[in-house]
Amino acid sequence: YFSAIKEGKPTAALIGFLKANHLSFEQLSLLKDGQQEVYAYIFTEEGILLKDRLQVIFEQAIKKIPVHKLMRWGRHSAQFVRPVHRVMALLGDKVIPLELFGKKSDRYTAGHRFLASTACVELKTADDYEKILYTHKVVADFDKRQQIIKAGLDSYGNWIGDQALLDEVTALVEWPVVMQGAFKQDYLNLPPECLILTMQKNQKYFPQYDKTGRLTHQFLLVSNVEVVDKVIDGNERVLRARLEDATFFYQTDLNIRLEDRVPLLKKVIY
């Protein structure tokens, strides 16, 4: 109030506000805001139907999803973390008319790419979403997928992994199946930190340790399919190659004494 009126006249700040909003002083109301009085313009904005606003709401919501790397596909300018094949949008048993990523919404979605009995799944109502997808080998709820993963990991005994790795693995699968693999015990001669880093960061595996807290030659992986033997063999083969590389670089480092590396510090700027 005091910054808006001076000696009974509108200040430059208030005049600027009126001009910017195409208002006159007579259109303002004097209101009490806590311990002070303020001038305000009171107006009624005409309401709109929610269905007429949903297109914009969804577009804005999608843009706010934190995605580090986006990609384009097809001939349109839409961007997302992966190509979008279909858009399903239901409110109750009604389809919400939308067009996102160049796709018009409908009541159809897809189950698991390899395990589902049919390629296309129709939903009668939105309430059926989680239940129907489960019958087509997709656990739609993130928290439930993670519970399945943790239960599977715990069934094999002690394992190493933080919440960040659990979250990442949970986001990578639709139908989680926990399996156990192993590598040659000779690789245990590598520093445990090297083994754990290779398994967790590069392969998204969960290393295992024994009752004494020592790292073992076994590890746990979370697969998106149920073909156990082939999945385990493939993952063991990939890990073997990575551990061979790690062994080579570690042995190469051991060939140079620490004191011989001291002269290299002259090239380091602190």
PLM regions and their residue ranges:
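Long, basic N-terminal domains or extensions that often function
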Residues: 1-187, 195
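Hydrophobic alpha-helix position signal
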Residues: 18, 269-270
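Catalytic nucleotidyl-transfer cores of nucleotide-processing enzymes
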Residues: 161-269
